[in-house]
Swiss-Prot record:
Its EC number is 2.7.1.30. GO terms for cellular component: cytosol. This is Glycerol kinase. ATP binds at T14, T15, S16, T268, G311, Q315, G412. The gene is glpK. Pathway: Polyol metabolism; glycerol degradation via glycerol kinase pathway; sn-glycerol 3-phosphate from glycerol: step 1/1. It comes from Streptococcus pneumoniae (strain Hungary19A-6).
Length: 502
């Protein structure tokens, strides 16, 4: 074992950081995970302490080495994947953040987003960035920090501050400030990057008054960005050579290299991405156009639908309502429910994502009767995840005029067999669950390994992550459509309830 080589993936997520060591077969050799604090300064605000994130990453790197006995000099390369859009602004000299990281879920910049919309910028931003104007993306978060931290705008203009999404922050820390870089997939989520021209957009920067000096350099998803400073990697100087936002990394880890391939990751939120090839395709139905990945001098675009609440709805059942002891238990309860699926939960806790984009909507429940049981409620919560996925798959098919035949799935909630079967039923297509559910980390490892020759090419990768289980639809058409119609009514009613009174 002494001289076998490995790839390390650092997967910095919304609630925890992980380091995973993979071997040449794409198998997990060891992993380490550490949760960190979620900060909620006000209703709807979500923040993280960027230093705590960095500490958690250092801790899991150590943990992965300890668990496996692998030495730092056996790591051929490091791949990074991260929660996207989450925004850090820090002091170039001290390396200290000037404010907490504002998390992708946070709605604290919603008034800024509304202001941009009312000023008539929707079309312009969509054409340039592929995104809709929303507090979800980094642009308004950067503006908010520069507005709310005393002297920040002035310091930014003087070039004393740096901005980055979490990938940028981690590379900057790991290289001890030698590299201030991001990749196509993360840059595409800032709402500051022109995805057609592949550059920071001067006009948008001017509209938001964000100084260009604070922005990182944008690079491809598979190349050497820098090397670890030995004192941050237990004596090792290892190339950091692959980087992608978590959802794009999962697309790559699912081996969705062909246009028309679609994957869904059931994480905290649920994110459905379709590879649309080298042509940028703007959605007419409120999906996001983004960059899937850029590799070997080519850029592959993607359509994406974001669902804000998926796995976190199960966490809510566990922590908020205390209906289940642990997440897997939700499957048992759902199977014990014998109602006729007339209960609908719309988990719009932080608004509705694609294709509705209603940031004022809040969670609601419909169809309760005196006979409704805890089991029925848990089942309806699981079903809400599948209904939201159907909303997006239907929209993708409209946008691209293609019939999606199979959905590749991964992420924590993809382990729930009840949910996967109901997903197949309500979509009427096959659900292919990856054998290796670590597709996000695997994608980052693949990108890193390719750029240093650890794996030769995409064909070699295709042998490494086959389908683990296939779920085929078994519900008849009229029942499927009747259930989905009920969901559409529930969403409509939720939006009516959220309307602002005159």
């Amino acid at each position: 074992m002494s001289q076998e080589k490995y790839i390390m993936a650092i997967d910095q997520g919304t609630t925890s950081s992980r380091a995973i060591i993979f071997n040449k077969k794409g198998e997990k050799v060891s992993s380490s995970q550490k949760e960190f604090t979620q900060i909620f300064p006000q209703a709807g605000w979500v923040e993280h302490n960027a230093n705590e994130i960095w500490n958690s990453v250092q801790s899991v790197i150590a943990g992965a080495f300890i668990e496996s006995g692998v030495k730092p000099n056996q790591i051929e390369a490091i791949g990074i994947t991260n929660q996207r859009e989450t925004t850090v602004v820090w002091d170039k000299k001290t390396g200290l953040p000037i404010y907490n990281a504002i998390v992708w879920q946070s709605r604290q910049t919603a008034p800024l987003a509304e202001q941009l919309k009312s000023q008539g910028y929707v079309e312009k931003f969509h054409e340039k960035t592929g995104l809709i104007i929303d507090a979800y993306f980094s642009a308004t978060k950067v503006r908010w920090i520069l507005d709310h931290v005393e002297g920040a705008q002035e310091r930014a203009e003087k070039g004393e501050l740096l901005f980055g999404t979490i990938d940028t922050w981690l590379v900057w820390k790991l290289t001890d400030g030698a590299a201030h870089v991001t990749d196509y997939s993360n840059a595409a989520r800032t709402m500051l990057y022109n995805i057609k021209e592949l550059k920071w957009d001067d006009e948008i920067l001017e509209i938001l008054n964000i100084p260009k000096a604070i922005l990182p350099e944008v690079r491809s998803n598979s190349e050497i960005y820098g090397k670890t400073a030995p004192f941050h990697f237990y004596g090792g100087e290892v190339p950091i050579s692959g980087m992608a936002g978590d959802q794009q990394a999962a697309l790559f880890g699912q081996l969705a290299f062909e246009p028309g391939m679609v994957k869904n990751t059931y994480g905290t939120g649920s994110f459905i991405i379709m590879n649309t090839g080298e042509e940028m395709q703007l959605s007419e139905n409120n999906l996001l156009t983004t960059i899937g990945y850029g590799i070997n001098g080519k850029v592959y675009y993607a359509l994406e639908g974001s669902i804000f609440i998926a796995g976190s709805a199960i966490q809510w059942l566990r922590d908020g309502l205390r209906m289940v002891e642990n997440s897997p238990e939700s499957e048992k309860y759902a199977r014990d429910s014998h109602n006729n699926d007339e209960v609908y939960v719309v988990p719009a806790f932080t608004g509705l994502g694609a294709p509705y984009w209603n940031q004022n909507a809040r969670g609601s429940v419909f169809g309760l009767t005196r006979g409704t049981s805890k089991e029925d409620f848990i089942k309806a919560t699981l079903q809400s995840i599948a209904y939201q996925v159907r909303d997006i798959i239907d929209t993708m098919q409209m946008d691209t005029q293609t019939a999606i035949q199979v959905l590749k799935v991964d992420g924590g909630a993809a382990m729930n067999n009840f949910l996967m079967q109901f997903q197949a039923d309500i979509l009427g297509i096959d659900i292919a669950r990856a054998k290796n559910l670590e597709t996000t980390a695997l994608g980052a490892a693949f990108l890193a390994g390719l750029s240093v020759g650890y794996w030769k090419d995409l064909d070699e990768l295709k042998l490494l992550n086959e389908t683990g289980e296939l779920f085929e639809p078994s519900m008849n058409e009229s029942r499927k459509e009747q259930l989905y119609k009920g969901w559409k009514k529930a969403v409509k009613a939720t939006q009516v309830f959220a309307e602002v009174d005159d």
